[in-house]
């Protein structure tokens, strides 16, 4: 504490940990606490967070609860899916993409109420502390950041419970013991980590899953759907136009019912350790296959291949917390430019955990059936043209072959 903090904006869920943090900020810093609770589609009633904050002495004018579902999907999830961003080949970045928006709103509230500090509940071992704080510093370089898990001496669940009881913080009965795993959720995904999941050799228990049914229990008949895209963004399901958040919620329902989107992953954290997580991204898994499908017929080969080369870097930037960095914005500009003609419709079959692309159509399609057909047509491909193409591409290989022959290699 290098300077006296007067007012701090806390990212507040209303749960036990952030309620303890709230009281700890009051007692340790003597600061006025402002709470911010974001509705990102986590599926929880948020009014209890307001009542909990009031119970802990927070004035009504210092309690902020915002429905950010549309902004989250429109301005964060959809731009990321234009890139087909996947971290380490599998992770759809559901937790990572939520942190920049929360950080942005905290800074906006801090400026509105005249706060000189922000605080979060991320631990000192994970990626979220980095993601939050990179966002804070990018948007308000002079802000003071308080990370209680890196400062306090509450090192065990027993100590946390004792602190809560000492300060009359309500504790749900199921929170008195160690939780079997921790959960983070928003409209894009639900992730579970820790405790029963820490041994990567052990199968994930059934009770961990919250957003998907077991693929083996999914219907024996497939579900067919169509998704319409306009300039890279999904806009309709089965012909019905929807807002971004409503559309993703509908895809979540469809994915859940068909056992789609489960991922058991050991990932490389930015902070240097490996961690195991159980991710459920039903709607996102469908959206990724659909977007790739419409790109197959609307993107030029060179643009498509360049996008594929850039994607891992884009995904890494999002995962590591560099959403507000110039390099992410540069990549986004290039990706968005590539999406000008990514408009059309894809047809999908959802079946027992699988998303199967069965059709795609676009007024901007680059697919020419007359060129690829084995039958003769009006503009049929002349097979003889291939000989010169192959010889020119083989020129350097033939030259190398001549050298090997000359040297007896």
From Swiss-Prot:
Q: GO CC terms for this protein? A: cytoplasm
Q: Where does ATP bind?
A: 11-19, 38, 121
Q: What is its EC number?
A: 6.3.4.5
Q: From the UniProt record, list the coiled-coil ranges.
A: none
Q: Which Gene3D superfamilies match?
A: Argininosuccinate synthetase, chain A, domain 2, HUPs, Single helix bin
Write out the pathway annotation from the protein's UniProt entry: Amino-acid biosynthesis; L-arginine biosynthesis; L-arginine from L-ornithine and carbamoyl phosphate: step 2/3
- InterPro entries hit by this protein: Arginosuc_syn_C, Arginosuc_syn_N, Arginosuc_synth, Arginosuc_synth_CS, Arginosuc_synth_type_1_subfam, AS_cat/multimer_dom_body, Rossmann-like_a/b/a_fold
The protein's name in its UniProt record: Argininosuccinate synthase
Organism of provenance: Nitrobacter winogradskyi (strain ATCC 25391 / DSM 10237 / CIP 104748 / NCIMB 11846 / Nb-255)
Q: Which gene encodes it?
A: argG
């Amino acid at each position: 504490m290098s300077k006296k903090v007067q007012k701090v904006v806390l990212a507040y869920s209303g749960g036990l940990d952030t309620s303890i943090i709230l009281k700890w900020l009051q007692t340790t810093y003597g600061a006025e606490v402002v709470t911010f609770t974001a509705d990102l589609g986590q599926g929880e009633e948020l009014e209890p967070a307001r009542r909990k904050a009031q119970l802990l002495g927070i004035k009504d004018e210092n309690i902020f609860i915002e429905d950010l579902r549309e902004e989250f999907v429109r301005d964060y999830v959809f731009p990321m899916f234009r890139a087909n961003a996947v971290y380490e080949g599998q992770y759809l970045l559901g937790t990572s993409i939520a942190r920049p928006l929360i950080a942005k709103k905290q800074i906006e509230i801090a400026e509105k109420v005249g706060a000189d500090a922000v605080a979060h509940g991320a631990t000192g071992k994970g990626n979220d502390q980095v993601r939050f704080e990179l966002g804070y510093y990018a948007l308000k370089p002079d802000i003071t950041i308080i990370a209680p898990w890196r400062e306090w001496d509450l090192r065990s669940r027993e100590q946390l419970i004792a602190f809560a009881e000492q300060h009359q913080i309500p504790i749900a009965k199921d929170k008195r013991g160690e939780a079997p795993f921790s959960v983070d959720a928003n409209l894009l995904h639900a992730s579970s980590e820790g405790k029963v999941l820490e041994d990567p050799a052990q199968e994930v228990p059934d009770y961990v899953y919250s957003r998907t049914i077991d693929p083996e229990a999914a219907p024996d008949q497939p579900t067919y759907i169509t998704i319409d895209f306009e300039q890279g963004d999904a806009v309709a399901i089965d012909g019905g136009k929807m807002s971004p958040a409503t559309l993703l919620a509908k895809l979540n329902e469809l994915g859940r019912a068909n056992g789609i989107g489960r991922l058991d992953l050991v990932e490389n954290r930015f902070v240097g350790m490996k961690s195991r997580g159980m991710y459920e991204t039903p709607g996102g898994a469908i959206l990724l296959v659909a977007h790739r499908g419409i790109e197959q017929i609307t993107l030029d080969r060179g643009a498509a291949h360049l996008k594929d080369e850039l994607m891992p870097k884009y995904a890494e930037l999002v995962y590591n917390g560099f959403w507000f960095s110039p390099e992410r914005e540069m990549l986004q500009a290039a990706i968005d430019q590539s999406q000008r003609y990514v408009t059309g419709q894809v047809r999908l079959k959802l079946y027992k955990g699988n998303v199967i692309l069965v059709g795609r159509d676009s007024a901007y399609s680059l697919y020419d059936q007359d060129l690829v057909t084995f039958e003769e047509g009006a503009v049929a491909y002349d097979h003889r043209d291939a000989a010169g193409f192959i010889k020119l591409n083989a020129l350097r290989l033939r030259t190398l072959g001549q050298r090997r022959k000359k040297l007896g290699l």
